[in-house]
């Protein structure tokens, strides 16, 4: 029996408990299940935006993990981030309560839907949001489960009335290859999550399975500007693949005539599909978010819209309705006519893309780029140490804080101070500095910010909370 049919029978599905319910992926699934009428509760170590939102819907939230939290539950949902020593997992095992992985629950929600799964090392959340906007503009009402807060919805998940479901597919532990999607998007593939995959080739193999597991009537959408994705596309012959890019002249969908500023990007699109005679040009598409990487994200959404025959008007209107995603180049403050941006970038490739966007804007304003970065996880820093040394070239000044551990134990020699020392010693940048305390960033901004500057606060840890407090802190100093 399928989960979505369970409520139609006389059987009762009792309480579903989410361990780590405040996580963005877990909170989205919990919200959808709640909206479907299931009894949902969960626990997390700290209160955050997601736990507060879920509580406002009447979902019970426990702060802290404890055996008694699952006293009256029938199912426990976990993500790969939950340690096996968690007391709630131990209690569930002791009492033989079924433990369901997050991806398995997501797959169950997708099973009877025509589903779009958005994967890739970077850009998943924005792309998922853009695809959803096009579906809505086409008169469809999709269910959406995203990896970030969609600004015009104030949530990362919402229940639709149509047979379509759009979901961000997390590749961190290979469970995404089992998601029953009809349309698969791959934005890019970079060395990431190697603590799980052990080597890059295994990660690439997982993405290949993600495409080949599609039904024969489905299709994939892939960015061939990325050389690893291009090679993957070349190796797959048994599934339909629509390609996109900016630099790839052989892509089916190409952006050109690009203009970008602090608030938006405008571009034209050339569409050359094998099942369509001739070439179609769509002029002056505007997305209300800056950056070349976001243009690529929008091309993935356009590919889906074209294949599903949404029409040019719906595509343009959909992008006009897009209001961005929380923590994706989000303006949080101004000081001395400089703009402070909060961004989720925590991988070297994401940092490059974010700083390139900031530099493009700052150059037009005769300003400079000040990067304040909080590394996330010792394991990521260890695997990508050399890449982190080279990813700050578009910043004029760099400030790197201590590593946000995210529950990991320190690794000998893997420190932010060591990274700064290597950047300076190898002459990759002459303005790299170690920031002993995150609070010291206030003085950095006061001492260095001037008109036209872009101050970029980056990381996946608690730097976002700090960035969102800056407006008040800086205002008190003017």
Curated annotation (Swiss-Prot):
A GO term, aspect molecular function: UDP-N-acetylmuramate-L-alanine ligase activity
Catalyses which reaction(s): UDP-N-acetyl-alpha-D-muramate + L-alanine + ATP = UDP-N-acetyl-alpha-D-muramoyl-L-alanine + ADP + phosphate + H(+)
Residues annotated to bind ATP: 120-126
Keyword Glycoprotein attributed: no
InterPro entries: Mur-like_cat_sf, Mur_ligase_C, Mur_ligase_C_dom_sf, Mur_ligase_cen, Mur_ligase_N, MurCDEF_pg_biosynth, UDP-N-AcMur_Ala_ligase_MurC
EC supergroup of this enzyme: ligase
Subcellular location: Cytoplasm
Keywords, ordered alphabetically: ATP-binding, Cell cycle, Cell division, Cell shape, Cell wall biogenesis/degradation, Cytoplasm, Ligase, Nucleotide-binding, Peptidoglycan synthesis
NCBIfam families assigned: murC
Function text: Cell wall formation.
Protein name: UDP-N-acetylmuramate--L-alanine ligase
The organism of origin for this protein: Rickettsia felis (strain ATCC VR-1525 / URRWXCal2)
């Amino acid at each position: 029996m399928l989960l979505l049919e369970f409520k139609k029978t006389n059987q009762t599905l009792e309480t579903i408990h989410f361990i780590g319910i405040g996580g963005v992926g877990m909170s989205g699934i919990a919200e959808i299940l709640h909206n479907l009428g299931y009894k949902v509760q969960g626990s997390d170590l700290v209160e955050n935006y997601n736990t507060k939102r879920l509580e406002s819907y009447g979902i019970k939230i426990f702060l802290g993990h404890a055996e008694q939290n699952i006293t009256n539950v029938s199912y426990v949902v976990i993500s790969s981030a939950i340690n096996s020593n968690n007391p709630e997992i131990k209690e569930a095992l002791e009492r033989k309560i079924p433990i369901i992985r997050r991806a398995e629950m997501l797959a169950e929600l997708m099973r009877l839907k025509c589903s779009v799964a958005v994967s890739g090392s970077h850009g998943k959340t924005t792309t998922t949001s853009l695809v959803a906007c096009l579906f809505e503009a086409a008169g469809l009402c999709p269910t959406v489960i995203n990896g970030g807060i969609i600004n015009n919805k104030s949530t990362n998940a919402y229940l639709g009335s149509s047979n379509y479901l759009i979901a961000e597919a997390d590749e961190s532990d290979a469970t995404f290859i089992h998601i029953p999607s009809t349309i698969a998007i791959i934005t890019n593939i970079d060395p990431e999550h190697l603590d799980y995959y052990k080597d890059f080739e295994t990660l690439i193999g997982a993405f290949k399975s993600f495409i080949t597991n599609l039904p024969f009537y489905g299709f994939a959408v892939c960015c061939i500007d990325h050389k690893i994705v291009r090679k993957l596309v070349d190796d797959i012959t048994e599934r339909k693949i629509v390609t996109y890019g900016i630099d790839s002249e052989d892509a089916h969908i190409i952006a050109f005539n690009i203009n970008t500023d602090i608030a938006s990007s405008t571009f034209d699109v050339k569409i050359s599909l094998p099942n369509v005679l001739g070439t179609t040009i769509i002029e002056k598409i505007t997305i209300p978010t800056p950056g070349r990487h976001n243009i690529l994200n929008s091309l993935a959404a356009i590919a889906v819209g074209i294949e599903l025959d949404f029409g040019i008007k719906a595509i343009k209107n959909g992008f006009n309705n897009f209001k961005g995603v929380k923590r994706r180049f989000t303006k949080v403050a101004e000081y001395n006519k400089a703009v402070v941006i909060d961004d989720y970038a925590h991988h070297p490739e994401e940092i490059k893309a974010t700083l390139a966007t900031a530099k493009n804007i700052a150059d037009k304003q005769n300003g400079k780029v000040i990067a304040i970065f909080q590394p996330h996880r010792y394991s990521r820093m260890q695997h990508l140490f050399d890449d982190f040394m080279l990813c700050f070239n578009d910043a004029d000044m760099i400030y790197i804080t201590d590593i946000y551990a995210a529950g990991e134990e320190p690794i000998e020699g893997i420190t932010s101070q060591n990274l700064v020392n290597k950047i300076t010693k190898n002459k990759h940048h002459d303005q790299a500095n170690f920031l002993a305390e995150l609070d010291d960033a206030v003085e950095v901004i006061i001492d260095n910010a001037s008109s036209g500057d872009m101050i970029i606060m980056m990381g996946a840890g608690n730097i976002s909370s700090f960035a969102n407090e800056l407006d008040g802190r800086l205002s008190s100093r003017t």
